[in-house]
């Protein structure tokens, strides 16, 4: 997974975990998606594992659009604590808010039941709770 090439500030404060997502709450590209039902952090290793599992399970049945990218650096303190500052960036993570669409599945050739099995398999690997959403006849979003 790629990391940000250049950022103005690499060492950030921790973000607020209380708020809900207001912008990315509906499916835009695909018929099926994975929606976060709680707020939390996704680290880069977790993102890579989730991507690998979904690609492995779905193979060539559809295109997958991942709606997350590691934006924030997680720092560790150095060995000498006194006056050393904040520390170097050790990992990258992204904040996933409750209600946001995290993954979309485009050009699906699978039924809703088969898709639900894949998402249930993938949900065990997530550090937050997620659920499947789908668009029914292009009119509205259905909770499954």
From Swiss-Prot:
A GO term for molecular function: structural constituent of ribosome
Keywords recorded for this protein, A-Z: Mitochondrion, Ribonucleoprotein, Ribosomal protein
A Pfam short name: Ribosomal_L16
GO cellular component, one term: mitochondrial large ribosomal subunit
Membrane-spanning ranges: none
Compartments where found: Mitochondrion
UniProt main location, coarse: mitochondrion
Entry-linked InterPro entries: Ribosomal_uL16 (IPR047873), Ribosomal_uL16_bact-type (IPR000114), Ribosomal_uL16_CS (IPR020798), Ribosomal_uL16_dom (IPR016180), Ribosomal_uL16_sf (IPR036920)
GO BP: mitochondrial translation
Gene3D superfamilies xref list: Ribosomal protein L10e/L16 (3.90.1170.10)
Superkingdom field: Eukaryota
Keyword field contains Mitochondrion: yes
SUPFAM superfamilies membership: Ribosomal protein L16p/L10e
Family: Belongs to the universal ribosomal protein uL16 family.
Record PANTHER family: 50S/60S RIBOSOMAL PROTEIN L16 (PTHR12220), LARGE RIBOSOMAL SUBUNIT PROTEIN UL16M (PTHR12220:SF13)
Protein name: Large ribosomal subunit protein uL16m
